[in-house]
A protein has these predicted regions:
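Conserved NTP-binding catalytic cores of kinases and kinase-like/nucleotidyltransferase enzymes
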Residues: 1-72
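Amphipathic, soluble alpha/beta structural segments
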Residues: 17-24, 92-96, 103, 141-145
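Conserved short hydrophobic patches within well-ordered secondary structure
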Residues: 37, 54, 88, 111-118, ...
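Generic hydrophobic, aliphatic-rich segments that mediate packing or membrane embedding
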Residues: 49-53, 63, 83-84, 103, ...
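Short, glycine/charge-rich beta-strand/loop segments that flank catalytic centers
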Residues: 65-76, 125-130
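Conserved structural core of kinase catalytic domains
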Residues: 74-106
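Conserved kinase catalytic-core helix
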Residues: 94-128
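Active-site catalytic-loop/activation-segment of kinase and kinase-like phosphoryl-transfer enzymes
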Residues: 128-146
Length: 146
């Protein structure tokens, strides 16, 4: 992906103020906050399921990178060459310092909170949807999960 490919952002209801490179992505400051643009090649059904889970977590106070829909209501947007991209609501922060006890303890607490939220009875609907999604996964996706 290069700067020319950022024209895919025209398919979103966003006004880009600035862009910079991230790890395998572009980060864009917009009127709706920070977003990340990354290349995507996978199942749209799985992506839809993933976004439902992330939204579920966000509603319960877990900070997540939510996928944004383009103006047509799709999660994946293609560039002029047919490459798929996703745009995620992003947030700035620093990485966990693995040499810092305080950072590690904080990460463990947050991970425990994440696990507790995902154990709620409401998550059963997501588990059933996941089982259905697993049946429609491509061979490539099944291979990656093994």
């Amino acid at each position: 992906m290069n700067e020319k490919d950022l024209v895919i952002l025209e398919q979103y209801d966003l006004h880009v103020q600035s862009t910079r490179r991230g790890r395998g992505s572009f980060l864009c400051d917009t009127d709706r906050g920070l977003v990340q643009v990354t290349e995507f090649s996978g199942s749209q059904e799985r992506l839809f399921f993933q976004n439902r889970v992330l939204f579920f977590l966000t509603e319960r106070g877990i900070r997540c990178d939510l996928l944004l829909e383009n103006t047509e209501g799709n999660l994946v947007t293609s560039d002029r060459y047919g490459n798929g991209y996703v745009v995620k609501k992003w947030f700035s922060g620093r990485e966990c310092d693995t040499k810092s006890r305080e950072d590690i303890v904080g990460a463990v607490h947050y991970l425990a909170r994440l696990h507790n939220v995902l154990r709620l009875p409401e998550i059963q609907e997501f588990q059933m949807a996941a089982a259905q999604t697993d049946e429609t996964d491509t061979a490539e996706e099944k291979k990656i999960r093994k």
